[in-house]
Curated annotation (Swiss-Prot):
The chain crosses the membrane at residues 2-22, 32-52, 55-75. This is Uncharacterized protein YfdY. Its main location: membrane. The keyword Transmembrane helix applies.
Length: 80
């Protein structure tokens, strides 16, 4: 499970860095915190839903960077 956590943290940092290059630093910081909160919510919800199955929970947590990237660009392109 620690490997999933490390890879998830790397994904969130990389997505935030990409958003920072494309939009600006404020967007990168806000998307970082949004993805961390989303990953925590997904973790607790899927742990409750699957009865503690960590593999399924770890796989579902990778929705956080993908959703964070999509949401950030939808909001970001609306401002330009």
């Amino acid at each position: 499970m620690i490997n999933l956590w490390m890879f998830l943290a790397l994904c969130i940092v990389c997505v935030s860095g990409y958003i920072g290059q494309v939009l600006n630093v404020v967007s990168a910081v806000s998307s970082f915190f949004g993805m961390v909160i989303l990953a925590a919510l997904i973790y607790y919800f899927t742990m409750w839903l699957t009865g503690g199955n960590e593999l399924v929970t770890g796989i579902f947590m990778f929705l956080a960077p993908a959703c964070g990237l999509m949401i950030r660009f939808m909001v970001g392109y609306g401002r330009r």
